């Protein structure tokens, strides 16, 4: 069995999303000690910003106008899609950046859509865990309720468009204890961290059995 893991944090060494994904992966590996893990880290190895446009434009160009840059982009799109489609289970670690989806993760989505768009849902029925973290609080009743424009979008793409069997693991207030203005939330943040760890353990166990 093969687990595909994608990380997107721009701070890999201190990433809260990667730490939770580590917990999910550990539970999966405990159940599948002989399983393989395919990894891609978009934070440390981002997709070139022009890759999607090059791959897409190549569809509309005559053969004599297709350059090596177009071919490289097409090959990368095929490689990314093949990684995903070879997976028996998927683990995505995607933090919230500036209230939305980070550009490097959006580029990955666009490249997958380029290759699989006409071939049916990319993750139909595949057990998938989405780990997402947010530095502040965005829940009901908070001053920034509704400012998280990432999670609804990702849920729409993964569960509705790609038809993944999706489980969501979330953690908020990750900047409490880092930003002085959030010190009053440190106790709540610690509680949310504990809950997120427990949710990640449960998600990992479930991922291993589905």
Name these PLM-found stretches.
Residues 1-94, 99-114, 198-210:
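N-terminal beta1-alpha1-beta2 submodule of the flavodoxin-like/Rossmannoid cofactor-binding fold
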Residues 5, 92, 128-132, 168:
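Structural beta-sheet core signal
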Residues 9-11, 135-138, 174-176:
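A short, flexible beta-alpha/helix-coil linker loop
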Residues 35-37, 128, 166:
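Hydrophobic anchor at the start of a short beta-strand
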Residues 42, 133, 171-173:
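Active-site donor-binding loop signature of nucleotide-sugar glycosyltransferases
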Residues 48-54, 142-143, 179-182:
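Short aromatic-enriched loop/helix-cap "lid" or pocket-rim segments at secondary-structure transitions
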Residues 118-163:
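Short, glycine-/small-residue-rich phosphate/pyrophosphate-handling segment
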């Amino acid at each position: 069995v093969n687990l595909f893991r994608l990380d997107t944090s721009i701070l890999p060494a201190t990433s809260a999303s990667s730490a939770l994904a580590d917990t999910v992966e550990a539970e999966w590996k405990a159940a599948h000690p002989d399983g393989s893990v395919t990894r891609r880290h978009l934070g440390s190895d981002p997709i070139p910003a022009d890759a999607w446009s090059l791959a897409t434009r190549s569809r509309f160009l005559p053969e004599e106008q297709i350059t090596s840059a177009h071919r490289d982009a097409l090959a990368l799109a095929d490689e990314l899609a093949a990684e995903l489609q070879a997976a028996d289970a998927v683990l995505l670690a995607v933090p919230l950046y500036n209230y939305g989806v980070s550009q490097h993760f959006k580029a990955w989505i666009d490249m997958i859509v380029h290759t699989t768009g006409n071939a049916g849902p990319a993750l139909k029925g595949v057990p998938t865990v989405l780990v997402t973290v947010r530095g502040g609080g965005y829940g009901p009743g908070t001053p920034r309720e509704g400012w998280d424009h990432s999670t609804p979008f990702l849920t729409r793409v993964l569960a509705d468009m790609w038809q993944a069997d999706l489980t969501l693991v979330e953690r908020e207030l990750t900047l409490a204890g880092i930003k002085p203005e959030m010190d009053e939330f440190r106790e709540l943040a610690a509680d949310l961290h504990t809950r997120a760890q427990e949710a990640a353990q449960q998600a990992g166990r479930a991922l291993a059995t589905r």
